[in-house]
Amino acid sequence: MQNQEILQQAADQARGLAIDAIHACSSGHLGLPLGAAEVGAVLFGKDLKVDPSDDQWLNRDRFILSAGHGSMFLYGWLHLAGYDLPLEEVKNFRKLHSKTPGHPEYGETPGVECTTGPLGQGVGNAVGMAIASKMAAAHFNTSEHEIFNHQVFALAGDGCLQEGVAAEAASLAGHLALDNLTILYDSNDVTLDAMADASQSESVIDRFASYGFAVEKIEDGHDMEAISAALERARANTEKPTFIEIKTTIAKGIPEVAGTSAGHGEGGAKFAEAARQGLGLPEETFYVSDEVRTFFADRKAQLGEARQQWDASYAAWRSANPEKAALLDSGISRDVPADLLNSVQEFAADANVATRAAGSQIINDLAKAMPLLISGSADLHGSTKNYIKEVGDFTKNNHSGRNLLFGIREHAMGAIVNGIAYYGIFRPSGATFAVFADYMRPSVRLSALMGLPIFHIWTHDSVAVGEDGPTHQPVETTSGLRVIPNLDVIRPADPEETAGAYVAALQRIDGPTGLILTRQNVPNLSSIPVQTRREGVLKGGYIARQEQGELELIILASGSELNLALQAAEKLGSSVRVVSVPCMERFDRQDDSYRESVLPRSCRNRMAVEAGVSDLWRKYVGLDGVVVGIDRFGMSAPGDTVLEELGMSVDNVVKQAALAGLSA
């Protein structure tokens, strides 16, 4: 049997798997798995250079299903291609604890490169992986051994490409001339509510051409020869990324809904029996023929042979380049130097600098200790102060640069940084003003969901921003970030706490961290030992001022308000303890004995001070405690004036303690 015939059989049987899985659970999305089946057949049956027996192979092609709602497309092809995804798991689609969740999830399913579902994120992730691949080649390839030379493919639909994050990411990909990236556009002219022309009229392919992509259009998206030829041209292109518009029929194989918005979801599954007959499939559900099984078993063996050839080259590279090999190993295992905290120089006792400015010295010290540390910014390196000196920028002509210039594209920055983290090897970060963290929130949420070891630098953290006014004063942002599960949010008080914050972010390999830094200068709190401050951040909270005699009042604070709390405590008396809580999440993870030593239950007289909304502090101060916060938007005036006007002063903290009967 000719390969073309067997691939068509595979495409139709993949359609059958999708129909049966979605019919069995009465939910899911049929449109893409049926409409793009021939695309899947060519990718997994012919084009992708992967090793299904090892889905972590370093030089594998990356395939990202950006349109994650079409997850049965991916699960069906991963099963057929021989990944560790048994048919029983396909049958368990969308069931509790299965390997086939409703949308693809990184770490849950072999062969799934990243979590997708929120449309457009996968395009940004793919751009990040393509950047990481170029970085890896620049850092590790030699003239004798090319160990990184794979491609990145993303399958996206109309919904993905209508999202702003995809537009931002694609614009940057074109600018960087990422010739290892191919975006496959499942162009079926349908969205969920209606035909696509009800909400868009531009030429998408022309838009991508303007971004700097090589573009082509396949009029019949079910013509596998045309798809294969286009993919070959994309792989051969060494000048720019490729965009292939593939005209498909949504829900092809179910005549009752094919080509209509009704074919998007699970509705067509009720025609499952008739659809199987139309596709030439037997009555048996979840049917895969012996011929298709044999074809993919043979292909898996061929891919294994190619992998063995790469392994031999890789072994020779390791032998010839032991230092590069050791660096690569450290990146893969996400090693952090044991003495990382000591690699950051201490600040002068009388230093008076913004924590963002302190971060400049810190990240440059850390970059020397961690050669795979990457720092990016959304056109704000000069303000966020996270530019790494003497390592260059990543550009289309310099793939070894370690600074990423994202432009004013916060959302894409979040998705691209996620893609670099998914790739492994590098430790990426991004930076913008704290108030713009909401522009990237979906990407931040996904990084937390997947436990990606990245960190974000969010500066200009409060009403102290001043004259720019309430549009740029993030009173609610820190609290809004703290409620994202598995995201550590650290708001350091001074330069030494900031050193601890950066190190905490890098030491954490099971999730993301956000650093909330000041625009305004803050004093170095040298009355507290340096190591106490640095190591205290690692625990999330610590005693910054020990009471004398009986403990009568605890004041908790974070960031720039720690100094305010310390000054207020001096006025309130010697029986006042001040606790610095730069990171609630880290503090809450400490064992009960440590938390009790810092916040003893026996002392219920508590107050908290932070220049932001007060809500989350109430879990520490209790029903009778007081929070001196800012539960309103700010105003335009010099920062000190705004702080005073909104109650962020020593006198007001003392006053509020007295009014609540909390005075020591």
Task: Please tell me what each predicted stretch does.
Residues 314-453, 531-543, 549-550, 556-559, ...:
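Non-catalytic terminal/interface segments that mediate subunit docking, oligomerization
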Residues 25, 61-62, 112-115, 145-163, ...:
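A short, small-residue-rich loop immediately preceding and capping a beta-strand
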Residues 4-7, 21-30, 58-66, 108-120, ...:
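A short glycine/serine-rich beta->alpha loop
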Residues 11-27, 185-188:
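N-terminal capping segment at the start of a domain
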Residues 4-15, 48-50, 87-108, 381-395, ...:
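Acidic-glycine-rich active-site phosphate/pyrophosphate-binding loop
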Residues 35-175, 387-388, 420:
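Cofactor-binding active-site loop characterized by glycine-rich and histidine/acidic residues
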Residues 95-107, 125, 131, 135-138, ...:
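Thiamine diphosphate
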Residues 58-59, 242-337:
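Terminal amphipathic helices with adjacent charged low-complexity linkers/tails
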